[in-house]
Amino acid sequence: VDGDGQHDPSYIPELVKLIEGGASLAIGSRFLVETDGFQSTFMRRVGIRWLSFLLELLTGKVVTDPTSGFRACNKDAIDLFCKSYPDDYPEPESIALAMKLGLPVMEAPVKMNERQGGRSSIGGFSSVYYMIKVTLAIVLVCWVHRGDK
């Protein structure tokens, strides 16, 4: 759960249900169902769709909200992330790593709120850096782990 108020803690039980149902990584997605919750800017949604497309292309699995930080993990995912977790924009890259290593990744629909405080680390020129960096990181993770499972 982010500390900026975007994630409604009332959805935590939904993520826990996915973990109890066999997911190693559960992601709260604002795109699984249409809600009246906060939706990010058009350009950010384009970027999210690009990352979703890239993950599906390289892993064969669909993740509708790969930038969501509203997540829960089981022991297997925690063990993996303790050994290897990106420290710069980690969400999409860590999803690719988990999927390439055969960990089940599932999403639950959640409603996101508008940021209550702080500023996004992604904006202006940094958004270009973010998209290039994360795209290359996903490609590299998928290439390095292409035969793993």
Positions of predicted regions on the chain:
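Residues at helix-coil transition
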Residues: 20, 56-59, 100, 140-144
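Catalytic donor-sugar/metal-binding loop of nucleotide-sugar-dependent glycosyltransferases
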Residues: 61-62, 83-86, 95-113
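DNA-recognition element of transcription regulators
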Residues: 92
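The conserved acidic donor/metal-binding loop of glycosyltransferases
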Residues: 2-6
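Terminal low-complexity segments of carbohydrate-biosynthetic enzymes
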Residues: 10, 21, 133-149
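Acceptor/aglycone-binding surface of glycosyltransferases and processive sugar-polymer synthases
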Residues: 7-88, 115-132
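Conserved residues at the C-terminal ends of beta-strands
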Residues: 1, 29, 111
